[in-house]
Amino acid sequence: MESTSCPRKTYAVYNTPYLTEGLTLLPGYGRMQGVVFRRDNPRFQHCQSVAEAMNAAAADPDCLMVNRNAGSGTRALVDRLLEGARPAGYMHQAKSHNAVAVAVAQDRADWGMAIDTVARQYGLGFLPVQPERYDFVIPASRADRPAVRRFVGLLRGETGQRLLRELGFDPSPV
């Protein structure tokens, strides 16, 4: 599986509508969301696009998905792609990208939505859906605290930027 770069101009943004007064958005890093599956799963072996993978999953009632938890950005993306469909396993919810990948890798589910870095970590197949930003929300009243300032320094510093790139993320703030 190839690393997927995240073009800054096409990031999906889920979090800004939830910001309330007194909260500050700290741009984080880019990552790629996509459909994950076991490479040896015959349903997905020849799929070249997300549409093909979704159609393959929908065509087989025994094909189980593992979903993300309601309220997560990934769940919003999944629901948009499914357009109201509720495939087998839809109610099986995982709370993290790693949990989705583990369920698929352990054959407890056939497919799910996770980020490319996690798919690589578990040796899963990956079909990119869209890049997104992972941002941080900080109460404005705490922005000057030493721990917050150190975190921002790490995130924006040369070492932090290099480490994010090595992990497959796009550290460029938007």
Per-segment meaning from a language model:
Residues 64-82:
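Secondary-structure junction motif
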Residues 44-47, 84-90:
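Short, structured loop/turn "capping" segments at alpha-beta junctions
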Residues 15-70, 161-162:
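A conserved helix-loop-strand patch within extracytoplasmic ligand-binding domains
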Residues 20-23, 27-34, 44, 122-153, 155-171, ...:
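Periplasmic-binding protein-like
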Residues 2-17, 101-130:
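A ligand-binding cleft/hinge motif common to bilobed small-molecule-binding domains
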Residues 68, 86-99:
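Short beta-strand-to-loop elements that line the ligand-binding cleft
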